Amino acid sequence: TNCGPRFTIIEDIPYDRPNTTMRSFTMCPECLAEYDNPLDRRFHAQPNACSKCGPRLELLDAKGNHVETSDVIATASQLLKEGKIIAIKGLGGFLLACDATNARVVKLLRQRKRRPFKPLAIMVADIDETKRHCHVSETEEKLLTSPQSPIVLMRWKPDSKVCQAVAPNLKYLGVMLPYTPLHHLLLKESSLPLVMTSGNISEEPICQDNDEAIRRLSGSADYFLVHN
């Protein structure tokens, strides 16, 4: 628990649910049955939860107001397709996301983030999508699909739809695969390669919680995809 998902929710030791931010979510009967069953793969999984008893997603506008929608993922994906910038709460902090094929919005993100030249990384749905944009060696594929989910620099294909504004004047593109369920859902629903860059203004610390993100990123993001 020195790093990774557990580190982002633990507040004290030992690593038990009452010592994590999951303590405020009471398990429903189905989740509790899984948790108590030694034969279940979720036996004593401290963050065990489901859509009925676990954390909830919420979409907010740039001022932090709730956006009414029956499907948060579908609405957020549509906004990305429309060229909006969304601050997404991930593991340990926020990311700023936009359509990596849209030069206008990528340039706007650079302007708002005050990062005019440094290359940006993208996230794509899977290894097949990666190969549409980059030449991928066997070693690079192993790195991409490893549990660490690193950003891997790979040679950019000339016919890639990822716009040049992502990494101006460079032959290599930084690519990562989804490493949380939320990322997987967004990438699947949007069918886009997405710029994923740290949720901060250049040289500032990354935003960690909802209130801080709304306060510091309201001039950078058009919407916020958060959870409780």
Q: How would you name each of these model-derived features?
A:
Residues 1-228:
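Active-site-adjacent structural elements in enzyme catalytic cores
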